[in-house]
A protein has these predicted regions:
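Extended intrinsically disordered, low-complexity coil regions enriched in Ser, Thr, Gly, Ala
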Residues: 318-343, 440-480
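Extended, low-complexity, turn-rich repeat/linker tracts enriched in Gly/Pro/Ser/Thr and Asp/Glu
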Residues: 62-69, 77-83, 320, 426, ...
Length: 500
């Protein structure tokens, strides 16, 4: 996604939560023990091994800004978040059964006249027993009013009677909170983010979107406004990936970020970069989470051949929080780790390559061009023009980027490499240019010519190839492009002839 915003409202009772353990104001107790989650299917290739997906990558705005600009204007507390919490990702197989009844619920399976024909009843409400056929409503107002009522299958008035004994009678609330809950017992009503009532009450953006994900009434046929007030044109459906089956399998890799004030530093929490805006009021952090190194594994999952879902949830938050994301993406690469041993022969012990030895990523002019006193900015290599995107009305330069390799504990005489398969005919090419930047990891000391970079190209990786090796100078922030080579291909052929 290009950009998104998520409100972690740890006090608010969310959709289809009938836990009666509420405060007198109708809020959830013990917010740190609660969680809020969103799930979506992986809509493109689910074989992460084939596509070589290596990272979950995104930019996040600092959620712990001081002062007025950092207040979470949720309409209840309107305070800054000062305590932090956990942001957790699940990749793999995640249950689609939102209502936990092993029945495939979809709104357009409900009776168009609100009768009980083809309906089953359980602790969650009314659910269809029909076979799922199409993802469209019947196109008339009466049917829409009787089907667009959420996954509980109940209209607001019927929710009160249905959950009276197991939920409402157990509540001890103020009159205001009681009235609010009785108006929408399942907390699933949709509210569009524009409206005269919102304008009159001067509602801020978080309050405007607070009920935008509601499932009841989010697909009206008509509207009394001069804009479309739909949340979605399609019926709600538990089948997220639309494969006509309801999966309740839970087997996934889990990745945890512990977000706390004072811990948002490069090198911690998978933070690899940060940008401070020109006004100095906000900081954006770039996260790059290596998916091959999960924090935990749940269930029976052993590879990345079928990654069908991603689930994101917040927990351990004592206070409401807003997380603002930009460029949330799964990052793959044409380059793959070279797993064969490159250790120089001799009497030394041969080490085994591990995932922690090397990380593959990219740096780009649009995301990594701001440096600091201790960090070099990324710049376009000299003589390399940025491509122009001619497919848009306004011509723009594309994002120029380069391969980045990060090494840990690279021992003397050892080498690590990446490779990609290609089919180049170099007969009409004259030269090979390489531009290389080298810098030590934080806290490490690295001297000029202590490491080298090498390029191999040929018909295979072990016996039939040309190799160019370049000892590296450590790049200083004020002196860029200190390493590079510009070699004529004809010279490589001459050197090869002399060698043999």
């Amino acid at each position: 996604t290009p950009s998104s915003r998520g409100l972690g409202d740890v006090y608010k009772r969310q959709q289809y939560n009938y836990n009666p353990d509420l405060t007198s104001s109708g809020l959830l107790k013990n917010p740190a023990s609660n969680f809020g989650a969103i799930t979506r299917s992986i809509s493109n290739d689910t074989d992460f091994d084939r596509t070589n997906v290596q990272y979950i990558e995104f930019w996040m705005m600092d959620p712990f800004i001081d002062g007025e600009n950092g207040k979470v204007l949720d309409g209840i507390f309107n305070n800054n978040n000062t305590t932090g919490g956990k942001l957790i990702f699940n990749l793999g197989n995640v249950s689609e059964d939102l209502m936990k009844d092993n029945i495939h619920a979809f709104e357009n399976g409900l009776s168009s006249d609100y009768s009980d024909s083809g309906i089953k009843f359980n602790e969650w409400g009314r659910v269809t027993s029909k076979q799922y056929l199409t993802k469209f409503f019947e196109n008339d107002n009466n049917s829409r009013e009787n089907q667009d009522i959420g996954l509980d299958g109940l209209k607001d008035a019927n929710e009160v009677d249905y959950f009276q004994q197991n939920f409402i009678d157990k509540l001890t609330l103020t009159s205001e909170a009681n009235e609010r809950i009785l108006s929408d017992v399942s907390a699933d009503n949709f509210k569009y983010y524009l409206g005269e009532d919102l304008d009159v009450n001067n509602k801020k953006i978080l309050e405007r979107y607070k009920n935008f994900n509601g499932m009841e009434g989010n697909t009206p046929l008509t509207s009394n406004t001069n804009f479309s007030s739909q949340g979605s044109p399609f019926p709600e459906n538990e089948d997220l990936n639309e494969d006509n089956t309801l999966s309740d399998l839970e087997s996934y890799y889990e990745y945890e970020l512990d977000l706390r004030p004072g811990s948002m530093n490069i090198g911690q929490n998978n933070i690899v970069d940060k940008i401070i805006d020109q006004s100095g009021n906000a900081t954006w952090y770039q996260f790059r989470i290596p998916i091959r190194n999960p924090d935990r594994i749940h269930g029976n999952i052993s590879d990345f051949k079928t990654i069908r879902f991603i689930r994101t949830y917040l927990t351990d938050w004592d206070e409401p929080v807003v997380l603002r994301f930009a460029k949330f993406q799964m990052v793959g690469s044409q380059w793959r780790k070279y797993d064969s041993n490159l250790y120089q022969s001799g009497l030394n012990e041969v080490s085994e390559i591990t995932d922690s030895d090397m990380q593959i990523s990219v740096v780009s002019i649009e995301e990594n061009s701001i440096g600091s006193d201790t960090k070099s900015p990324y710049v376009v290599p000299p003589g390399i023009p940025r491509d122009i995107d001619n497919t848009t009305i306004v011509q723009r330069r594309t994002n120029e980027q380069s391969l980045q390799l990060c090494f840990n504990d690279l021992s003397d005489g050892d080498a690590k490499a990446v490779f990609k398969e290609s089919n180049f005919d170099l007969i009409n090419y004259g030269r090979i240019k390489m531009f290389i930047h080298a810098e030590p990891n934080d806290g490490d000391i690295l001297s000029d010519d202590e490491i080298s970079a090498f390029l191999r190209f040929g018909s295979d990786y072990e016996n039939n190839y040309y190799e160019i090796e370049l000892p590296l100078k450590i790049t200083r922030p004020s002196l860029l492009n200190q390493n590079g080579s510009n070699i004529a291909l004809s010279l490589i052929h001459i050197w090869r002839c002399r060698r043999f």
